[in-house]
Amino acid sequence: MIISLIAALFVSPPDTLEASSVTASRNVSPPSESVSGVVLRDASSAADAIRDFSGIQLRDYGGVGGLKTVNVRSLGSAHTAIFLDGVPIDNAQNAQVDLGRLFTEDLETIELYAGQKSALMQTAREYGSASSLHLRSSLPDGRKLRLKFRGGAFGTISPSGSVETRRGRFAARLRLGADRAHGQYPFHTLDLGKDTILTRQNCDIKAFRAGGHLWFLPQGGRYEASVNWYDAGRGIPGPVFKQSGKYPMSEDRQYDRSLTAQISGEQSLGHGLSLLVKGRYSLDILDYVDVSELDPSISATWNYNLQSAYAAASLGFQALPWLHLNAAVDAQADWLTANVKAQRQQVLGAFSSAFLLDPWRIQVSAQYQGTSDGYRFLSPALLVDWHPRFDWEFGILGKRSCRLPSFNDLYYTNVGSRDLRPEKVWQVSAWWLWDRSFGPWSFRIREELYFNHVTDKLIAVPNGSLFRWSMFNIGTVHVFGDEWSASSAYTAAAWQAGITARYSFNRAFDPLNPWQIPYIPLHSGSFNIFGVWKSFRADIRGQVTGARYTAASSRPEAFLPAFTTWDMTLSWKGPWGLRLAVELRNITDTRYEIVKQYPMPGFHVMGSVSVEI
């Protein structure tokens, strides 16, 4: 049905899409961080697009096919809910969403909410998430054909294309993409004090993706339906270590096939009522070939079949001009078939009330979560915003949330422990924001102080490969943080320039052990500058990550030094939607590791050409 509707739209002449409004989206505070426009389009994946955000730690295990996850404010990647067009993306098997698989060609924006999203209409899942990352697809504004080719270092070849149209209140998009790379790159290691150059192996990838998206926008509403397919085979780069006089390299392979279908709808019903519904079904088939690094003739193949069904409904009511009420219910079921079988059903219910007392905005909410395997949890939250002037904002947040153990955490022999307890978090934060324009100048400064109290902290550490992890509770963790961001831009008739600087202080430790918890830098930051002149644009991005430890101790073998990387992108925009771009990555050829024994690439060059007709 969806395919036939999309086909009908493409053969019909384009028309004007009338404006529609959904009242529930008003009165929303800005996200903690966001990215859009050229920077988002130039990113190779969602992981690449958000790497400059303050307050996050992006775990990157190197290589084109390496796992990439995001950790917000030292809470772990499982506490960050990922949403695509308002529908959650998750993985009940290992609680790890690989951001390297989420591409940006058709995205309008990526927004990070570190704490509570303030929208009046939300699903129950959103109310209980410690933080959330929202990816939103762009809405077609006419009939267009987009073609893009990206390639360069590591043997990368990545063609993609999309065709979109709109007619009346309908819009549609079809897209295809492929990725291929051998992924090999040189790296340095110390062998008996000597600098030895080796080549990173088993980083190749072959992937194909396809999808379709359909929109219907009646008066006062918005409805979407999409289907996506992903098929990939990749090498899994293992850690670099020396044993028996050699450096055994991982030969593990991973094959993914993923089908997802999702729908969402939001409608104003009149008399102050608004309805929000969402649904998603996903099928993920994963085959993992586990090859012994010391004896490649020994291998084992693991097959995993994960199905997930999700449904949500939310009803909002504008009881008074200054009072908005919202009740939400989510239900999700997950089934995993492998060498063990596991299933989990969970129901989430939430209620919130928002008091819109200008210049104050107060939101009180509570989420209840219950699962078929016996977990019960209540997540209350209080969010207060104060706008004394149009250019100033102050806010405070108090919230409780939890992270359930995944199937891998609980059931797998090499990984799991059935004695694991849910990880519980209390979050408290306060922030201020100044955002002002003076003629051609614009300025924005934001600071946020936060404290996280974590009990029964779940720690995941790679156990020889990216597929086998060791899981354990470590008790209590305290996280104190301070985030700053400042930006300025100047816009003239023929040129534009801007600068953004970010800094994060993050002290995360077990009260019984004064050392920083593993992989969390005390200091980090980023620096971005751009300039536009006529059809030319230049972007410079710098990223600073402080020293870290791979264990909560000061042992020299657990130390990871600080590093700084610099990237530059040069682009030219020509007629007929032609755009050429050259990306210079790690210009200073810095040698660094984000994860111990997983070396990252040095200097490399990527290029792209795109056409929009």
What residues fall within each predicted segment?
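Membrane-embedded beta-barrel scaffold of Gram-negative outer-membrane proteins
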Residues: 272-288, 394-395, 423-480, 487
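Gram-negative outer-membrane beta-barrel transporters
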Residues: 321, 326, 359, 450-453, ...
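N-terminal periplasmic "start-of-domain" segments of outer-membrane beta-barrel proteins
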Residues: 17-46, 69, 77
